[in-house]
Regions:
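Acidic/histidine-rich catalytic neighborhood of metal-dependent amide-processing enzymes
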Residues: 1-45, 58, 63-78
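Short helix-to-turn junction characteristic of helix-turn-helix DNA-binding domains
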Residues: 177-178
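Alpha-helical metal-binding/catalytic segments enriched in His/Glu/Asp
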Residues: 1-3, 88, 120-121, 187
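A structural supersecondary motif
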Residues: 84-91
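Short alpha-helical segments that sit at the start of domains
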Residues: 139-172
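Short, glycine-/Ser/Thr-/acidic-enriched flexible segments
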Residues: 29-30, 91-95
Length: 214
């Protein structure tokens, strides 16, 4: 702990500077509740991914803010790396009376609890691997949509009903949000447009040469 993370950061300094997010696995097999400790950037995708999975699992969980007392996180998230690292725990450190006492032993943990947490971590890793991210090929100002037959020829200046997102609005949102960082699920969350529709529009714009998948 701590010195191991520091040693690894020293040995893999160049490689770690290319990493955006990670997981610190700790206190994962106790009898207590599932905990989710966020990374140092509140709105980073790693936090959104974990939160979605925990909500979908219908497990009661406790959400903890980033805490400077997380010694490994301090190293990976240091100024030279700034890797957003989060944790899923079961009986989080400092949150149970047995912590760092003689009762914090093999009788306190169980394979069943460990397996529950392992399954959640596996889901998170799979979701990270499956993220679909697009980037606009014209990031400097707005693309001329009429050139690509994407702009309506009649009534283009008319504003649609306030509660209805027109197809054009959705195209504009996808183009605006596709910055090479947000996944299609992130765009869906931020625009309140169904993910399947965001993905369909993104693929359509990719074929039009306006977006590229990264």
């Amino acid at each position: 702990e701590t010195i191991g993370a520091i040693s690894y950061c020293h040995l893999k300094e160049k490689e770690l500077q290319e990493i955006d997010m990670g997981l610190v696995i700790t206190t994962v097999a106790g009898p207590g509740p599932i905990g989710f400790k966020k990374s140092f950037e509140e709105h980073h995708p790693i936090n959104k991914i974990i939160r979605r999975i925990l909500q979908k699992s219908n497990s009661d969980f406790i959400e903890y803010p980033f805490d400077i007392n997380g010694s490994d996180e301090r190293q990976y998230s240091a100024k030279g790396f700034r890797i957003n690292t989060a944790s899923i725990t079961k009986s989080k450190y400092y949150e149970y009376s047995e912590y760092h006492t003689s009762d914090d032993n093999l009788q306190f943990i169980s394979a069943e609890n460990l397996n529950e947490t392992l399954n959640l971590y596996t889901e998170v890793i799979n979701k990270i691997d499956d993220r679909i991210i697009f980037e606009s090929v014209s990031p400097y100002c707005e693309t001329m949509l009429s050139k690509h037959n994407l702009y309506p020829t009649v009534g283009g200046a008319q504003k649609p009903d306030i509660d209805v997102k027109s197809k054009l609005d959705k195209v504009l949102w996808v183009l605006f949000k596709s910055d090479g960082k947000l996944s299609t699920e992130d765009v869906s969350d931020e625009t309140n447009i169904d993910h399947s529709e965001i993905l369909k529009i993104s693929r359509f714009l990719e074929k039009k040469g306006l977006l590229k998948e990264i």
